Regions:
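Secondary-structure end/capping motifs
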Residues: 281-384
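Sec-exported extracytoplasmic/periplasmic mature domains
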Residues: 82-85, 91, 109-113, 128, ...
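Pocket-lining segment of extracytoplasmic ligand-binding domains
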Residues: 120-122, 130-131, 200, 204-326
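Periplasmic OmpA-like peptidoglycan-binding domain that tethers envelope proteins to the cell wall
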Residues: 485-582, 586
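N-terminal hydrophobic or amphipathic helices and topogenic motifs
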Residues: 32-94, 346-432
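Bacterial N-terminal signal peptides
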Residues: 14-28
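Short, glycine-/small- and polar/acidic-enriched structural segments
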Residues: 34-213, 217-234, 255-261
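Periplasmic peptidoglycan-binding/tethering modules of Gram-negative envelope proteins
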Residues: 400-480, 488-501, 573-587
Length: 587
């Protein structure tokens, strides 16, 4: 038989083909898929293909085009339009969806719209691009904080944030997770470059045909075993982890879990509107009316969400319109409603005043701008720091027509102190080593002298500032304040052959004393926060007496080691997976 003429092959006739076939059969599916991942090189936004050859043009007159992205925060903007509040402010507007941030930047540069919609991280990444074109960006309005919609999924070997050092993490380039990752790494004492960021084009699995290429973090994490983590949106996190711990079935990754989400780091991802500075200068009153309409609309939107059962007509109309604008189909109501269940917090008037003026918070525009741009310089996402302004609104005037214009209201109680104390004691009893490692995002220590009972802000101001910054950034975490005693008396009792009863009494006395010290430190810290003018959720801070259960040096040999055992540890704990054991009933 003439094999060539028939177009058929046999293994015997083609040894090379046979070898290739055997290699393919032996090669795991994951390895084959991993080879299709299309990673990108980090570079400033102005260097991306979309913006090559783009130049600044005057903003077109007429209709004000308002960009949206597929995020629950933008549902409030849609409701503002539905209520006719933009028209009442004398604005003729057109809402449009653009999830490709580079395309948004292109539209603003070319004058299609003066408005840019993104997170603070994305807007800071764009600031250098506008500076190179001879203008700047002005941040006008904060829509939301992400409070659950963004997650870090990890493989079983990663137990804490510090375990990420030297590891590979997938995330979208120019997307909302750039500063999310760098901020939480810094809070854990790591530098942005301590983690190997693997950049991808898309935020989530794209709807278009990628021709076999993997271009998003979820798909990359599923395909590549060398990825230790992935920054993903909550639906992708649920898929990868099977809603808890990945089983390896139905697109999940065996053993994968959410290390933390923006439910814990709930003051990191800030969604905002910005405007071209040249347009703002020429049209300040018009832009102010735009922001005022957003504030009025957000207040009405919050009222609708609270009373949707009694106003189903308006609610269904909003959800249908949002589904059409944000998901491309008025039938996608489940996607809209699913996103309204806790992915974000709409900040409203009070939140805008706090964010832009610093009233009652450390998580301000200026703070985020500085930490984001510093991190982006390290990662090569910026070549130099870029100007980014605020509008400098008169917020008293902006409050006109609002039902609620209070600022710096004390935060809601997130945890039930009794339930939290009981759960923490239970977890410590199951193993101190496990308690100190699993779920611990970060910890730091202060030290005290023998028989010291009092603790003041003057003594520990640096530590208290650090604790305040951590609690403000990671507002969904529990921060335990753990008292630790030196084991000297216990060691002596054991050496002297004391009875088990006597040893138990010494251990209990040490635990009681360490608890009293933890309480004293907690109170001194809360007093410090009051003096700083920053309202805090006191339930976030839990005093714990560790006694002699976890000495740094079980048998200290030097005075330095002896002193190091007398300490109070501030420990930031993620409690997302067991939240019912900590939160007040009905919340």
């Amino acid at each position: 038989m003439n094999l060539k003429s028939t177009g058929k092959l046999t293994l015997a006739a083609n040894p090379l083909f046979a070898l290739l076939l055997i290699m393919l059969l032996l090669c795991p599916h994951e390895a084959l898929a991993a080879g299709n991942i299309e990673y990108l090189q980090p570079k400033p936004l102005y260097d991306c293909d979309t913006l090559k050859g783009v130049h600044l043009k005057p903003v077109k007159g007429g209709v004000l085009k308002i960009p949206l992205i597929t995020w629950p925060g933008d549902v409030a903007t849609i409701y503002t339009d539905q209520l006719g509040l933009f028209k009442k402010e004398g604005l003729d507007v057109q809402l449009f969806l653009e999830n490709d941030f580079a395309k948004q930047v292109k539209a603003v540069l070319e004058g299609e719209t003066p408005l840019l919609r993104g997170t603070m991280g994305m807007v800071n990444a764009a600031a250098e691009t506008f500076a190179k074109q001879g203008t700047e960006l002005v941040v006008l309005y904060q829509l939301t904080w992400s409070t659950g919609g963004d997650c870090l999924v990890v493989r079983p070997g990663v137990k804490s944030l510090t375990d990420l050092k030297g590891k590979n993490v997938a995330l979208q380039l120019y997307g909302p997770h750039m500063d999310y990752l760098t901020t939480v790494l810094k809070k854990a004492g790591l530098r942005p470059t301590d983690v190997h960021a693997r950049w991808l084009k898309e935020l989530s699995v794209p709807a278009y045909d990628t021709h076999g290429k993997i271009v998003d973090p979820r798909s990359a994490f599923e395909a590549a075993a060398d990825l230790d983590g992935a920054m993903v949106i909550s639906p992708d996190a649920n898929a990868l982890t099977s809603g808890g711990t990945g089983t390896g079935a139905e697109g999940s990754v065996r053993g994968a879990r959410v290390l933390f989400s923006s439910k814990s780091a709930n003051r990191v991802i800030s969604d905002v509107y910005a405007v071209r500075a040249d347009y703002f200068k020429a049209n300040r009153a018009r832009v102010e009316r735009f922001v005022h309409a957003l504030m009025l609309g957000q207040e009405q939107f919050s009222k609708l969400l609270a009373n949707k059962s009694s106003d189903q007509g308006a609610y269904k109309k909003l959800v249908s319109r949002s589904a059409e604008l944000l998901f491309g189909s008025p039938q996608a109501v489940a996607d809209v409603e699913g996103s309204l269940g806790g992915d974000c917090e709409w900040v409203g008037y009070s939140g805008n005043v706090s964010f832009f003026t610093g009233a009652g918070t450390t998580r301000t525009f200026a703070k985020l701008k500085d930490e984001i741009q510093s991190s982006f310089l390290e990662l090569g996402l910026l070549k130099s720091k870029a100007p980014l302004q605020t509008a400098g609104w008169d917020y008293k005037a902006m409050a006109a027509g609002l039902a609620n214009s209070k600022v710096a209201v004390a935060p809601k109680q997130a945890f039930d102190p009794t339930k939290a104390q009981r759960q923490v004691e239970k977890e410590i009893a199951s193993g101190v080593g496990k308690w100190e490692k699993e779920g611990s995002l970060y910890s730091f220590e202060i030290y005290f002298a023998p028989r010291q009972a009092g603790f003041t802000a003057a003594q520990y101001s640096d530590a208290f500032k650090k604790a305040l910054e951590l609690s403000q950034t990671l507002g969904g975490t529990l921060i335990t304040i753990e008292g630790h005693n030196s084991p000297d008396a216990l060691n002596k009792a054991k050496a002297d052959g004391k009875s088990d009863t006597q040893i138990a009494l010494i251990e209990q006395a040490a635990k009681n004393l360490s608890y009293q010290r933890a309480i004293a430190v907690r109170q001194a810290y809360l007093d410090f926060c009051k003096q700083a003018g920053v309202p805090v959720d006191e339930s976030q801070f839990l005093a714990v007496g560790m006694g002699t259960s976890s000495p740094k040096f079980p048998v200290p040999k030097t005075e330095e080691q002896w002193n190091a055992n007398r300490r109070v540890v501030f420990r930031v704990k993620s409690v997302e997976t067991e939240l019912d054991s900590f939160k007040p009933s009905g919340k």
